[in-house]
Amino acid sequence: MKASISIDEKKDFIRWFLNKHQMKTREAMWVLNYIAGHDQIVKYVHFVDNLEGCARGLSLSAHGVESEPFLFFKGNIMTTDPEKAFHDIRLNWDEELYVELHFEEAITSPEYALVREDNPFTAVKLADEEKEMADALIYQSVHQFSREKVLQQIDEALDARDEVTFHKLVRILQQMDTVKE
């Protein structure tokens, strides 16, 4: 997760984007200009790779890519009408707005990378190998913690000169070490 992206960084990106790319609809340009002109709105804007799971999103496309020119959705309602989107953005300026931009070379754009954030609603997908590594790390951590706890209890049993507890804990420690191997 990257650090918070400043309002100025987002505004600079929008200006760069509009200077570099021609939107498929002029209304998309108007909406982006409106957003960039209002810090209180920019504060709630998040640029993401996909809008999956987002409660409120705006998908905009520049010429040169195969995707819808303009989509706005809030909850289960989706529209291609820029006026409805503009109206919602203007009235609900203090709600999170996730923006997905489609343009040539978006994936390799350093400017876009600076403002792009992880979609907090998208589940992280791990490969089987990564899951196995995570499971092994968790198992190892729990084992190490448990072993240290038993060693601490052995020290306490020695300090208390409690032979019965000491021998019981040594057997537990030996079993733990056998299972680990």
Swiss-Prot record:
Question: Matching Pfam families, A to Z?
Answer: IDEAL, UPF0302
InterPro entries cross-referenced by the UniProt entry: IDEAL_dom, UPF0302, UPF0302_N, UPF0302_N_sf, Virus_scaffolding_prot_C
Q: Which family does it belong to?
A: Belongs to the UPF0302 family.
NCBIfam families (alphabetical): PRK03636.1
Protein name (Swiss-Prot/TrEMBL): UPF0302 protein LMHCC_0635
The species this protein belongs to is: Listeria monocytogenes serotype 4a (strain HCC23)
